[in-house]
C-alpha cells in the first residue's frame, strides 16, 4: 500500500518545501490541479528537482488531446499523470499508450463517473495503472465519503491498482486502510495540519498497520 500527498493550494516553492519535509513518509507527491492551473507544468519540474525518492504525480485531469498532454507532463518530470474516467475511450487508450511508452503510469480519476462498476471494468481492460475513486471538494462539503465507491471498484477490477482520495485525514485513514486499497491519497489532512510531518508520519504508520 502506497501513500500519496496531494498538494493543491500552495505555490510551487511552498509545495516543494512541504514535500521535502514529509518525503520520508510518502511514496508519491502530487502537484494538484490548482497549482497546474496557476503555475503550469514548470511546477511539476520544480518539485521533481527538489525531492529525491518519491514519485511525482501531475494531476492534469485530462479530458482530451490525451497523448499530447501526457507527453508534456512526462517531459516536465511526471512519473504518473491523471486523466478523467469520463473521458472518451479513445482518449484513455491514447493516454495509457503514451504513458507506457515512456515507462510512466496513468491514474484514472473516477470523479463524476455515474456507473462506477461498469466504467471500472472498462478502464481495467484498457490498461489503466491506477483507478482512483475520488470524493471531490464539493461532495465532501455534503458529508460524502469514498468508502462505498472504493468497495465497488475493488470488487470488479483484476489488473489495475485501486487508489482512493477525498477528505482522508490521519484520524480517518484507518477506515480506508481496512478496505486494502493500493494507494491512499491524502491532501489537506497533511498539508493543512498544524504539524504536517507528524500527520504524514501518522498516515504512514496507519497504512503499515503498526
Swiss-Prot record:
Catalyzes the condensation of ribulose 5-phosphate with formaldehyde to form 3-hexulose 6-phosphate. SUPFAM superfamilies: Ribulose-phoshate binding barrel. Pfam families: OMPdecase. It comes from the Bacteria. This is 3-hexulose-6-phosphate synthase. One of its GO terms (biological process) is formaldehyde assimilation via ribulose monophosphate cycle. Keywords: Carbohydrate metabolism, Lyase, One-carbon metabolism. Pathway: One-carbon metabolism; formaldehyde assimilation via RuMP pathway; D-fructose 6-phosphate from D-ribulose 5-phosphate and formaldehyde: step 1/2. It comes from Staphylococcus epidermidis (strain ATCC 12228 / FDA PCI 1200). PANTHER family: 3-KETO-L-GULONATE-6-PHOSPHATE DECARBOXYLASE SGBH-RELATED. Belongs to the HPS/KGPDC family. HPS subfamily. Its EC number is 4.1.2.43. GO terms for molecular function: 3-dehydro-L-gulonate-6-phosphate decarboxylase activity; hexulose-6-phosphate synthase activity; orotidine-5'-phosphate decarboxylase activity. It catalyses: D-ribulose 5-phosphate + formaldehyde = D-arabino-hex-3-ulose 6-phosphate. Gene3D superfamilies: Aldolase class I.
Amino acid at each position: 500500500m502506497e501513500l500519496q500527498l496531494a498538494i493543491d493550494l500552495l505555490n510551487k516553492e511552498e509545495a516543494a518545501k512541504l514535500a521535502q519535509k514529509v518525503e520520508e513518509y510518502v511514496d508519491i507527491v502530487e502537484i494538484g490541479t490548482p497549482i497546474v492551473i496557476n503555475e503550469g507544468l514548470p511546477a511539476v519540474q520544480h518539485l521533481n528537482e527538489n525531492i529525491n525518492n518519491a514519485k511525482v504525480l501531475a494531476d492534469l485531469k485530462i479530458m482530451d488531446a490525451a497523448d499530447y498532454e501526457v507527453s508534456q507532463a512526462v517531459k516536465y518530470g511526471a512519473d504518473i499523470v491523471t486523466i478523467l474516467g469520463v473521458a472518451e475511450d479513445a482518449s484513455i487508450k491514447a493516454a495509457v499508450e503514451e504513458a507506457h511508452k515512456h515507462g510512466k503510469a496513468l491514474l484514472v480519476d473516477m470523479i463524476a463517473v455515474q456507473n462506477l462498476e461498469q466504467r471500472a471494468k472498462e478502464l481495467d481492460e484498457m490498461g489503466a495503472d491506477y483507478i482512483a475513486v475520488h470524493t471531490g471538494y464539493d461532495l465532501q462539503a455534503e458529508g460524502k465519503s469514498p468508502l462505498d465507491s472504493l468497495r465497488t471498484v475493488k470488487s470488479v477490477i483484476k489488473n489495475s491498482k485501486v487508489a482512493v482520495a477525498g477528505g482522508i485525514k490521519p484520524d480517518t485513514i484507518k477506515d480506508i486502510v481496512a478496505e486494502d486499497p493500493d494507494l491512499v491519497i491524502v491532501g489537506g489532512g497533511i498539508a493543512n495540519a498544524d504539524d504536517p510531518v507528524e500527520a504524514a508520519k501518522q498516515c504512514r504508520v496507519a497504512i503499515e498497520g503498526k
